[in-house]
Amino acid sequence: SCAKMRKLVHPDFYHIFPTATTKKVKEAESDAYLPLWREFTAEQPYGALPNWLEHIGVEGNKQGNISAEEARKIIQKLSLKAFEAEYKILLIWQPEMLNQSSANALLKILEEPPAKTLFLLVCNDANKLLTTILSRTQRVSVPQFSDEDITSYLAEKAHVESSRAKQIAYLSEGNLNKALALSKNQGQGKHQWFANWM
């Protein structure tokens, strides 16, 4: 069960995340992107929405969103009995990307959830959620990474030289994804690196 959760393949662990149509995938639903989602979270555990959209091949100015149809399908899935575990878990990544109709569809199940069902809403800005959704959740704030944490991570995992890791940690403002992006530019001259960062 733990191995299935780690690989994001547990049958009682559902995922909703912003999607968009691409040349390869014509249905903008989370299920269609699930293999790519698992790959993305393994490769970029601190990835942001733009990283995700790039990973799935979204081109141009398309923005990801979570459709009302997707919300209705997840309600159907959650109404089923759990397959293996005692609880069913729904992870909604970037719930700020719910449009009005999808938020309203999910609101119904948040108001009256099936027994032994947990909802995890992982967002960057809780103020962008509908107040009716926010009022039905228990907020847990995750602090930004400290400069020391980022410096240590960059030195150990990305093999960035210590003084350079400290500079990047300071510039990244507690955002490990931003720090990793900045560290990839370390081969460039300092002036070029700073210009790109700006």
Name every feature range the model reports, one short phrase each.
Residues 1-4, 14, 115-118, 124-198:
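Charged, glycine-rich active-site and insertion segments that engage polyanionic ligands
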Residues 1-101:
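Clamp-loader machinery-focused feature within the broader ASCE/P-loop NTPase space
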Residues 76, 108, 135:
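Conserved adenine-binding aromatic site and its adjacent loop/helix in ATP-hydrolyzing domains
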Residues 79, 104-118:
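Conserved catalytic/switch belt of AAA+ P-loop NTPases
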Residues 89-93, 106, 117-123:
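Structural recognition of the conserved hydrophobic beta-strand(s) that form the central parallel beta-sheet
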Residues 97, 112, 128:
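Residues immediately C-terminal
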Residues 101-105, 132:
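Generic recognition of short, well-ordered alpha-helical segments
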